[in-house]
A protein has these predicted regions:
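Gly/Ser/Thr-rich helix-start
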Residues: 31-32, 46, 125
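Hydrophobic/aromatic-rich alpha-helical bundle segments in the mid-to-C-terminal region
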Residues: 93-155
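Short, flexible helix-adjacent loops and helix caps
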Residues: 13, 59, 130-134
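Hydrophobic alpha-helical segments
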Residues: 1, 22, 27-28, 112-115, ...
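Alpha-helical structural segments
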Residues: 2-6, 10, 24, 41-72, ...
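Helix-turn-helix
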Residues: 6-41
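Helical hydrophobic small-molecule/effector-binding pocket
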Residues: 56-97, 108, 112-113
């Protein structure tokens, strides 16, 4: 998954091929095909890998789930990976069901309307960032994150 992620991050979604991933991983294409019989299977594996990594990072936080979600969701330290992954998913919209299922589980963690609003706002900010739209002026970023964290506090 790291090799596929690196190809996608470095060269963009269009460059993600089984050949490029095998080269990056230093394995034969046949070896890669044993684990991922198609590009779609590779994309699914990469998606599941990153969703799981996000959940594990939240799980390591000492904060309650929703507060950790807001903190983790407001930052994409992946160097453009999520933009590229989004582009790849456009080719395989059936894989969005994986994201929908995870999102349902995550949103179910919200115990109040305010907490849910904080999560939805976090997702909106993340999506705006994916599209390269700056919706929060830099001087207000901390204040907005602070307010979302206040909303995320469970009663």
């Amino acid at each position: 998954m790291q090799a596929a992620s690196e190809v996608t991050r470095r060269e963009g979604a269009i460059a993600l091929t089984l050949d490029a991933t095998a080269r990056e991983a230093g394995v034969s294409k046949g070896g890669l095909l044993y684990h991922f019989p198609s590009k779609e299977a590779l994309v699914q594996g990469m998606l599941e890998y990153h969703l799981e990594a996000f959940e594990q990072a939240i799980g390591k936080s000492e904060k309650p789930f929703v507060q950790a979600y807001v903190e983790m969701g407001s930052y994409d330290g992946s160097g453009g990976l999520f933009q590229s992954l989004s582009a790849v998913l456009a080719l395989y919209p059936e894989l969005l069901g994986i994201v929908r299922e995870r999102s349902r589980r995550w949103y179910a963690q919200a115990k109040s309307v305010d907490a849910l609003v904080a999560m939805l706002a976090t997702d909106g900010l993340f999506m705006a960032d994916l599209m390269g739209v700056e919706v929060v002026p830099g001087n207000l970023e901390r204040a907005v994150l602070g307010r979302l964290l206040e909303l995320a506090k469970e009663p």
